[in-house]
UniProtKB/Swiss-Prot annotation:
The keyword Transcription regulation does not apply. Residues 80-83 are annotated as: Involved in Mg(2+) ion dislocation from EF-Tu. The lineage of its organism: Bacteria, Bacillati, Bacillota, Clostridia, Eubacteriales. Keywords: Cytoplasm, Elongation factor, Protein biosynthesis. Associates with the EF-Tu.GDP complex and induces the exchange of GDP to GTP. It remains bound to the aminoacyl-tRNA.EF-Tu.GTP complex up to the GTP hydrolysis stage on the ribosome. This is Elongation factor Ts. NCBIfam families: tsf (TIGR00116). Coiled coil: none annotated.
Length: 303
């Protein structure tokens, strides 16, 4: 006879459903340790079965060290917004961001083999979470920053839909440096720059843009002598759209980001330099399969 106490203990240890726990205990004649093994085996099988499903929902999470000198941003995907709001999923994503900040891993493959806790790797812990919550999940990507002189700052928008990580360098500690990092996070989240500066833009791409603008201007009947000026004007506009330092500050449309930083550098009494930034948007680039609900129900009923 399997006791309710044994079922409860097994549920607490594994997170599996009540009936699954009862079946596992029945199979193992009430041996909890063996039942844990059975559930792990079944959980792994369930996780493998789910791994083919599209995981385009989820969360972007960040973590900043106490000294504000390092930080990380991660994207953890699942299949539905329902699971993305689950407390266990959120806690896993938070823990993942913290681990990513201090890890020596440089790829997702290396990261998931890091220790999640004293008993499991990140991949093993994720597999257990997949088994408990019943959806495919993937650690999609992560980036970590660290700076000796300056700060690393992050911002999360829309409950984990968009995340930003920024590294700002300065030789002095000043509230102005923190303010720059904070405002840049907001700017990047809102304006979505693709590059830090004009120098980072691929020149082959610029030449292609110039040729497109040149042909457009000629097709509009513009005189050749002013076409080049028009092309350069459009290229400058392109820079202002895609380069962070060239963008107009979202809080003051009369001021560029570069001018804002220069003003804050005067307050700090030292140059402030933006070293790098990254912006994650949940699910970007993942093709989500839209299923017909009626067809899905019929499929599950075997019709």
């Amino acid at each position: 006879m399997i006791s309710a106490k044994s079922v409860k203990e097994l549920r607490e240890r594994t997170g599996a459903g009540m009936m699954d726990c009862k079946k596992a205990l029945t199979e193992t004649d009430g041996d909890i340790e063996k039942a844990v093994e059975v559930l792990r085996e079944k959980g792994l099988a369930a996780a493998a079965k789910k791994s083919g499903r599209v995981a385009a929902e989820g969360l972007v999470k960040t973590y900043i060290s106490e000294d504000k000198k390092s930080g990380a941003i991660v994207e953890l995907n699942c299949e539905t917004d329902f699971v993305a709001a689950n407390e266990d999923f959120i806690a896993f994503a938070d823990a993942l961001a913290k681990i990513a900040t201090s890890t020596s891993a440089t790829t997702v493959e290396e990261l998931v083999n890091e220790k999640f806790d004293s008993e499991a790797t990140i991949q093993e812990a994720l597999t257990g979470l997949i088994a408990r919550l019943g959806e495919n999940m993937t650690v999609r990507r992560f980036v970590k920053f660290a700076v000796d002189n300056g700060v690393v700052k992050s911002y999360i928008h829309g409950g984990g839909r968009i995340g930003v990580l920024v590294e700002v360098a300065c030789d002095v500690e000043s509230p102005a440096v923190e303010e720059v990092a904070k405002e840049l996070c907001m700017q990047i989240a809102a304006a979505n720059p693709l590059f830090l500066s004009k120098e980072e833009v691929d020149q082959d791409s610029i030449e292609k843009e110039k040729e497109i603008y040149r042909v457009q201007a000629l097709n509009e009947g513009k005189p050749e002598k002013i076409v080049e000026k028009m092309v350069m004007g459009r290229i400058q506009k392109y820079y202002k759209e895609v380069c962070l330092l060239e963008q107009l500050w979202v809080k003051d449309g009369d001021k560029t980001i570069t001018k804002f930083i220069d003003e804050k550098a005067k307050e700090a009494g030292s140059a402030i330099k933006v070293n790098r930034f990254v912006r994650f948007e949940r699910g970007e680039g993942i093709e989500k399969v839209e299923e017909n609900f009626a067809e899905e129900v019929a499929k599950q009923l075997g019709k």
